[in-house]
Amino acid sequence: MDSNTVSSFQVDCFLWHVRKQIVDQELGDAPFLDRLRRDQKSLRGRGSTLGLDIEAATHVGKQIVEKILKEESDEALTMTMASTPASRYITDMTTEELSRDWFMLMPKQKVEGPLCIRIDQAIMDKNIMLKANFSVIFDRLETLISLRAFTEEGAIVGEISPLPSFPGHTIEDVKNAIGVLIGGLEWNDNTVRVSKTLQRFAWGSSNENGGPPLTPKQKRKMARTARSKVRRDKMAD
């Protein structure tokens, strides 16, 4: 096992512990709490994959951080902070929409890279809006927190979320997953639109009809999904 992988996990565990103390003292805002919950799931998955105990890793991570801080000058810390771009947190969804439990009548789940896509196949002939909470850096989507599909009535009918055991994803991973989600919903004659905020930071533009400009790869993937569905329907007949 690579030593850098282990030490990175140990430091992440300790930093999560510090952030948890901030939340316990009611000093964190909603985006801070969202990231804390997401990272908790990620750390559990990484710990299971690496075969490492989180509590023990936290103690070692504390020692690593304390050693670095002891050697770090205030001037070097200031220069590092000034040269590091800050990410922003974008919220399409309210806290209630983000945390609400939802249920599927005809559930379908698909893993697309490091992202999990869930769709309720029972939903038909609805107008659906995709909304997401995510972080942005350099005016581009950095990390997806959660994406959900809402009907006009406010019901949740689809979702894209990072896999806890597979941390890290790219903007292309997110766009590919959105293409799969849209394809799955549109096959049941639903009309799907993407929020202007998500269009702007994921694709760098927005369409009047709310549809994201899919890449040729995404279009081919949707076409393969369509052909597969047609074959299944024929076999069922």
UniProtKB/Swiss-Prot annotation:
- GO molecular-function terms, A-Z: protein serine/threonine kinase inhibitor activity; RNA binding
Which residues fall in a compositionally biased region of kind Basic residues? 217-237
Q: Domain note for this entry?
A: The dsRNA-binding region is required for suppression of RNA silencing.
Q: Which Gene Ontology cellular component terms are annotated? A: host cell cytoplasm; host cell nucleus
Q: What is its main location?
A: host cell
- Taxonomic classification, please? Viruses, Riboviria, Orthornavirae, Negarnaviricota, Polyploviricotina
What are the start and end residues of every segment in region (Disordered)? 205-237
- Motif Nuclear localization signal is found at 34-38
Q: Does the keyword Ubl conjugation apply?
A: yes
Write the gene name.
Answer: NS
The record describes its quaternary structure and partners as: Homodimer. Interacts with host TRIM25 (via coiled coil); this interaction specifically inhibits TRIM25 multimerization and TRIM25-mediated RIGI CARD ubiquitination. Interacts with human EIF2AK2/PKR, CPSF4, IVNS1ABP and PABPN1.
Q: Where is this region: RNA-binding and homodimerization?
A: 1-73
Asked whether the keyword Ubl conjugation is assigned, the reply is: yes
Q: Where in the cell is it found?
A: Host nucleus; Host cytoplasm
Q: Region CPSF4-binding: which residues?
A: 180-215
The UniProt similarity line reads: Belongs to the influenza A viruses NS1 family.
The record ties this protein, via InterPro entries, to:
NS1, NS1A, NS1A_effect_dom-like_sf, uS15_NS1_RNA-bd_sf
Q: Kindly state which keywords UniProt assigns to this record, in alphabetical order.
A: Eukaryotic host gene expression shutoff by virus, Host cytoplasm, Host gene expression shutoff by virus, Host mRNA suppression by virus, Host nucleus, Host-virus interaction, Inhibition of host innate immune response by virus, Inhibition of host interferon signaling pathway by virus, Inhibition of host PKR by virus, Inhibition of host pre-mRNA processing by virus, Inhibition of host RIG-I by virus, Inhibition of host RLR pathway by virus, Interferon antiviral system evasion, RNA-binding, Ubl conjugation, Viral immunoevasion
| Descriptive protein name | Non-structural protein 1
- Please name the GO terms of the biological process aspect recorded for this protein, alphabetically: symbiont-mediated suppression of host cytoplasmic pattern recognition receptor signaling pathway via inhibition of RIG-I activity; symbiont-mediated suppression of host gene expression; symbiont-mediated suppression of host mRNA processing; symbiont-mediated suppression of host PKR/eIFalpha signaling; symbiont-mediated suppression of host type I interferon-mediated signaling pathway
* Modification after translation: Upon interferon induction, ISGylated via host HERC5; this results in the impairment of NS1 interaction with RNA targets due to its inability to form homodimers and to interact with host EIF2AK2/PKR.
Q: Where is this motif: Nuclear export signal?
A: 137-146
Q: Outline what the protein does.
A: Inhibits post-transcriptional processing of cellular pre-mRNA, by binding and inhibiting two cellular proteins that are required for the 3'-end processing of cellular pre-mRNAs: the 30 kDa cleavage and polyadenylation specificity factor/CPSF4 and the poly(A)-binding protein 2/PABPN1. In turn, unprocessed 3' end pre-mRNAs accumulate in the host nucleus and are no longer exported to the cytoplasm. Cellular protein synthesis is thereby shut off very early after virus infection.
Region (PABPN1-binding): which ranges? 223-230
